[in-house]
UniProtKB/Swiss-Prot annotation:
Tissue: Expressed strongly in testis and pancreas. Also detected in brain, colon, liver, lung, ovary, placenta, prostate, small intestine, spleen and thymus. Not detected in heart, kidney and skeletal muscle.
GO biological process: chromosome organization
GO molecular function per UniProt: DNA binding; identical protein binding
Compartment(s) of residence: Nucleus; Cytoplasm
Family stated for the protein in its record: Belongs to the BAF family.
Binding partners and assembly: Homodimer. Heterodimerizes with BANF1.
Main localization of the protein described in the UniProt heading: nucleus
Protein name, entry field: Barrier-to-autointegration factor-like protein
Function recorded in the entry: May play a role in BANF1 regulation and influence tissue-specific roles of BANF1.
Keyword DNA repair in record: no
GO cellular component: a single term: nucleus
Pfam families: SAM_BAF
Keywords from the UniProt entry: Cytoplasm, Nucleus
Length: 90
């Protein structure tokens, strides 16, 4: 856990609950706006999509890039964050 970003460490420190999507590591302000505009305003909704994709990081990353304009780096960070959260809490 030493090489984790502070944002990732904070996200993994507790259940998702009602956290806004901007709490997810990898979600920039601009990407959060794009997600919220299309109805994904909570972290648990984004996690739900990740789970619907069977935790397939490559597929999830393509979805973020194609549908919401995420950069490759944002998509990778976000999928890694959700994968790590699943490992801790599911």
């Amino acid at each position: 856990m030493d090489n984790m970003s502070p944002r990732l460490r904070a996200f993994l420190s507790e259940p998702i609950g009602e956290k806004d999507v901007c709490w997810v590591d990898g979600i920039s302000h601009e990407l959060a706006i794009n997600l919220v505009t299309k109805g994904i305003n909570k972290a648990y909704i984004l996690l739900g999509q990740f789970l619907l994709m069977h935790k397939n990081e490559a597929e999830f990353q393509r979805w973020l890039i194609c549908c919401f304009g995420a950069t490759e780096c944002e998509a990778q960070q976000t999928s890694h964050c959700l994968k790590e959260w699943c490992a801790c809490f599911l």
